[in-house]
Curated annotation (Swiss-Prot):
Role according to the record: S-layer protein. The S-layer is a paracrystalline mono-layered assembly of proteins which coat the surface of the cell.
Keywords per UniProt: Cell wall, Cell wall biogenesis/degradation, Glycoprotein, S-layer, Secreted, Signal
Taxonomic lineage: Archaea, Methanobacteriati, Methanobacteriota, Methanomada group, Methanococci
InterPro entries: S_layer_C (IPR022651), S_layer_central (IPR022650), S_layer_MJ (IPR006454)
Glycan-bearing residues: 112, 138, 158, 197, 226, 291, 374
Keyword rRNA-binding: no
Entry's localization field: Secreted, Cell wall, S-layer
Range of residues in the leader sequence: 1-28
Keyword Hydrolase: no
GO terms (BP aspect): cell wall organization
Protein name: S-layer protein
One Pfam short name: S_layer_C
Length: 558
């Protein structure tokens, strides 16, 4: 049975470990050809700190061992990736870069095996996890759970199309890392574009017909009905970065997000130094009794250059912000057994983002809270006691002028984060649409701080002469041999498996560029310019055990 990439979830760039690749201590006899130094291969696999290849495994490979080998090679490539930053006064400015595309839809062929009808509306959806976007799909209209007020012309949508995942969009696998809410829930990003085949103006995107969302889902769930309450202190993705929900302010109809700096416990009277002259102090904790229940009030201060610039005294939980610089979310407080002093459990954030509901967050994009109202998705701009417990996420909706006359070569920008592109691939019979990301995210880190962005985690451990920081990019570089052609490849290729398991390897053997059969030893071969001008590295052998030996040898020497 042919495999799909979704089933091979382990094949991703992830440098945390090299899976089982280093488990074997047995020296293998491996035949090499086409290169004299493994450094040559490393330069082919990674360029400027980024993956420069695809790892290709056979869709009909008879052995899962080839899949494991491909996963281990991909993981090793991930461990070789890095980012550079400039160092100044104990901090580093870093940039994380990512590129990825969603699946595509041909407007001239894929609408019920025909062209998209005149005046029809289609909603295209992609997400950081394809399981989320899949649940939006509907061949006969808008998503079944979506209220008409979520998008303009939602009641006119004729078809909702799932374009799968954009691998470099952000997903958070644990929104509650400190177990404030005893939750292992997830959060992911979703983008939507509603496109009309307007006979007078070509393809058109109207006002209110694009949406970006970040939603909190119950652990391992993907239906919108199973989204769950977004709480203060939770981590959610927002435009490619993992951020803290600092405050959900009913009085101000605003949601504050921030970059987490410290998550833990501070003793009464102590301070935490954020750098740049900022400190957070727990000045006092006072216990009172209300209806035979202990209630703890916390006096929390934000200081700048030693002066108090913001202060709040209230019962926990409580929130405090100062400008766009610092946010404090106190979850709970308590005293020691003797009642001598207290402790506050909190998260401190910097670089705050204030999303004022029904106001522009950036030009042409307004912010809203997303509600799960008994299974129905709604947007809300007026938070109150009756609906705040239904808030499951944040939305930014396009509020600019219509974008018309769209055709091949055009692209629609979504928050300077994702683009929606049209491409006829130089054919009059095609017009494909898809989502695409080519994005940089910048961050400034002090020693010991980390940031998660575009599915990469960067931690600044120390300041060196050159701030080169390894990163673990989780955007997949794996492909099936049914998805890659030697004639059209746009990157170097690592082919895992012999001619029986991998059809691209077979093509090279049939063309006389590689000698490999069922009796061949473990082999690592470099074949320059064999894939549309790109280099090919073959990791294979006469059987699956020999292929495994070759994979382990490659990993050991990179």
């Amino acid at each position: 049975m042919a495999m799909s990439l979704k089933k091979i979830g382990a094949i991703a760039v992830g440098g945390a470990m090299v899976a089982t690749a280093l488990a074997s201590g047995v020296a293998a006899e491996v035949t090499t050809s086409g290169f004299s130094d493994y450094k040559e291969l490393k330069d082919i696999l990674v360029k400027d700190g980024q993956p420069n290849c695809y790892v290709v495994v056979g869709a009909d490979a008879p052995s899962t061992m080839d899949v494991v080998s491909a996963a281990d090679i991909a993981a090793k490539i991930g461990s070789l990736c890095y980012k550079e930053g400039t160092v100044e006064d104990g901090s580093a400015d870093i940039t994380v870069h990512a590129e990825a595309n969603s699946d595509d839809f041909d407007l001239k062929k894929d609408w019920n095996n025909s062209a998209m009808p005149a005046n029809a509306y289609a909603l295209f959806v992609a997400a950081s996890d394809g399981d989320y976007s899949e649940k939006f799909e509907n061949d006969t209209g808008k998503p079944s759970f979506m209220d008409n007020g979520v998008l303009g012309d939602a009641d006119k949508i004729n078809k909702t199309v799932d374009l799968g995942d954009i691998a470099t969009m952000m997903k958070v696998d644990d929104v509650d890392p400190s177990d404030w809410y005893d939750s292992d829930d997830d959060a992911g990003e979703i983008v939507m574009v509603e496109l009309k085949n307007d006979t007078s103006d070509g393809f058109t995107v109207y006002k209110k017909n694009m949406l970006y969302e970040t939603l909190v889902y119950k652990d391992d769930e993907e239906n919108f009905a199973n989204t769950t309450k977004m709480e203060e202190g939770m981590r959610i993705p927002f435009l490619g970065k993992e951020m803290v929900v600092v405050d959900i302010d009913k009085d101000d109809d605003a949601i504050y997000l921030g970059t987490p700096v410290y998550d833990g416990i501070i003793k009464e009277g102590e301070t935490y130094d954020l750098g740049n002259g900022y400190q957070v102090k727990i000045k006092a904790i006072l216990k009172t009794t209300v209806n035979n229940t202990d209630v703890y009030k916390v006096d929390v201060q934000i200081l700048k250059d030693g002066k108090v610039v913001a202060e709040k005294y209230d019962k926990a939980p409580l929130e405090l912000e100062y400008k766009d610089d610092v946010g404090v979310t106190v979850h709970k407080a308590w005293e020691n057994v003797g009642g001598d002093y207290g402790y506050a459990e909190l998260v401190i954030s910097k670089d705050l983002k204030k999303l004022e509901l029904d106001e522009e967050y950036v030009t042409d994009w307004k912010a809203y809270a997303v509600l799960n109202d008994n299974g129905t998705m709604k947007l809300e701009d007026d938070l109150n006691d009756n609906n705040v417990d239904k808030v499951v996420g944040i939305a930014l909706r396009y509020d600019g002028d219509k974008l018309d006359d769209l055709d091949s070569g055009d692209e629609v920008d979504i928050l300077d984060y994702v683009k929606f592109k049209l491409d006829d691939e130089d054919s009059n019979d095609k017009l494909k649409v898809y989502f695409s990301m080519d994005k940089d995210v910048d961050a400034t880190l002090n020693i010991g701080e980390k940031v998660k962005a575009l599915n990469a985690e960067v931690k600044l451990k120390d300041i060196k002469a050159n701030a080169v920081e390894p990163v673990s990019l989780t955007a997949p570089i794996a492909k099936l041999d049914t998805e890659v052609s030697l004639d059209t490849a746009d990157k170097n290729l690592v082919l895992v498996g012999g001619p029986v398991a991998n059809k691209l390897t077979k093509e090279l053997v049939d063309a006389g560029k590689l000698a490999l059969d069922n009796n061949s030893p473990a082999t690592i071969a470099l074949i320059p310019d064999a894939a549309n001008g790109h280099d090919v590295i073959v990791v294979a052998g006469g059987d699956r055990e020999k292929t495994r030996e070759a994979a382990l040898e490659l990993i050991k020497n990179l």
